[in-house]
Regions:
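Membrane-embedded alpha-helical bundles of multi-pass enzymes
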Residues: 2-220, 246-247, 255, 274
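Soluble catalytic domains of enzymes that build or remodel membrane lipids, polysaccharides, and related
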Residues: 214-418
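Short, intrinsically disordered terminal tails adjacent to the first/last structured region
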Residues: 1-2, 286
Length: 418
């Protein structure tokens, strides 16, 4: 193996390990390792084939980080592993493709100063992640900043820079560190410059962490002074995917969520008691409580949460046209609390085509309060990529057909008792 080929292989291995270990995975999650990925791509820009090397540097890691798509295809789409694994591999190749573009662009500016090169790297990374978020159907998974989500102090700059802007900031810091380290080990003449570059990168990351620590320290006080405390009851039904969409399980799923909601409200009554004044009295909940409480206890303290939250597609039927929609509305009326929940939404296009949306609904005791359609959908789970819209993959969509991406819509207001 030639020196050039060995170097490309080493960069590919380093980049892929950085992507996999730097993002949540079932093995080992080392958030800061993700910063080695843009550094590996910067080094790839100095090879004879920057695009190919940069692309290869991300494929295994991105495919491994998206392992859950293959698992879903195998477990719920009933694909043999021979067909399920390529779902993750193809998406990994697509994500890594943008890394190849980054290396190719950085190869064009290899002769500028390291400071300018790092600044360019940050801007290019920002633009590439932003473009990947909307290009085609948009695929915004595995962003650089998302790798740090496990450390709250390090993600607070998102409040100022946004996800893609912070990714660009991190990429610039990683490239500065790479420039510095290559000089530190490159000979005595360049060590001073390398120390300054690496120190600047460390200063950038320290500033981000310091801002995060400061923000986490002051925000509780600011929220207490300026905001309104809101209490939630969150319910996760954990309904098995292989039965979730079966028509015969729809009522069972609805009643399961109703029971869990009542259990959650009861469990929190003690903590919330006395915190609110205007609340439905226990007598108002008696009809529903008498139906679903196994022990027949229809008493609840006046203190209840402000909002009930159920997850994405919690209800396995089209709302509001589904046969159980009336019972769901009755539940919310009797609880006297607003409910945010997910369910499929069905619309008709002007051409008469049926359009399916992954929709979040707000339902209040007074009636429907608005909805939001999910914009970034999961390939092979919520839709089939255009180039792979084959009949063989239809089982992955759980018999629903593909969801349509939503358009940007104004947020709806949740009515609070206070």
């Amino acid at each position: 193996m030639s020196i050039s080929l060995r170097r490309c292989a080493a960069l590919a291995a380093a980049g892929s390990l950085a992507v996999f270990l730097g993002t949540p995975n079932p093995a080992v999650h080392l958030p800061f390792v993700m910063l080695a990925y843009p550094a590996a791509l910067l080094l790839a820009s100095r090879t004879e084939a920057p695009f190919r090397t940069g692309w290869a540097a991300g494929i295994p890691g991105a495919a491994a980080a998206l392992y859950w798509i293959a698992v879903a295809a195998h477990k719920y789409g009933y694909f043999p592993w021979l067909l399920a694994a390529p779902c993750s591999i193809l998406l990994g190749m697509y994500v890594a493709l943008w890394g190849g573009v980054f290396s190719w662009i950085m190869a064009r500016v290899r002769n500028v100063s390291p400071w300018r090169r790092a600044a360019i790297a940050g801007c290019v990374w920002y633009l590439l992640e932003w473009t990947r978020g909307w290009f085609g159907t948009g695929f915004s998974w595995l962003t650089l900043s998302s790798g740090l989500a496990a450390w709250p102090e390090l993600v607070q700059p998102l409040s100022v820079l946004g996800e893609y802007g912070y990714s660009g900031f991190l990429a610039a810091a990683a490239c500065l560190a790479c420039e510095g380290l290559t000089r530190l080990f490159g000979g005595a003449a360049s060590r001073k410059a390398g120390l300054v570059l690496a120190g600047s990168a460390a200063l950038m990351l320290t500033a981000a962490a310091s801002f995060g620590s400061w923000r986490l320290a002051v925000m509780p006080g600011r929220l207490a002074a300026e905001g309104v405390p809101v209490s939630f009851t969150l319910v996760q039904g954990s309904v098995r995917q292989d039965v979730k969409w079966s028509p015969e399980y729809q009522r069972q799923t609805l009643e399961h969520y109703m029971r869990l909601t009542l259990d959650g409200v009861r469990a929190n009554v003690g903590a919330l008691s006395g915190a609110k004044e205007a609340r439905p009295q226990a007598a108002e909940l008696a009809p529903f409580m008498g139906r679903f409480a196994p022990e027949g206890d229809a008493t609840l303290a006046p203190a209840l949460p402000d909002v009930l939250l159920w997850p994405e597609t919690a209800m396995p039927f089209a709302y509001p046209s589904g046969p159980l929609s009336g019972e769901l509305r009755g539940f919310v009326r009797e609880m006297g609390l607003p409910l945010l929940f997910g369910a499929p939404g069905v619309e008709r296009s002007p051409e008469g085509k049926t359009l399916l949306y992954n929709r979040a609904y707000l339902l209040t005791p007074a009636g429907d309060g608005g909805h939001y359609d999910k914009e970034h959908l999961v390939p092979f789970g919520e839709y089939l990529p255009p180039v792979l819209d084959w009949k063989i993959f239809e089982s992955l969509l759980q018999g629903l057909g593909g969801f349509e991406p939503g358009t940007q819509e104004p947020l709806f207001a949740v009515p609070l008792s206070n």
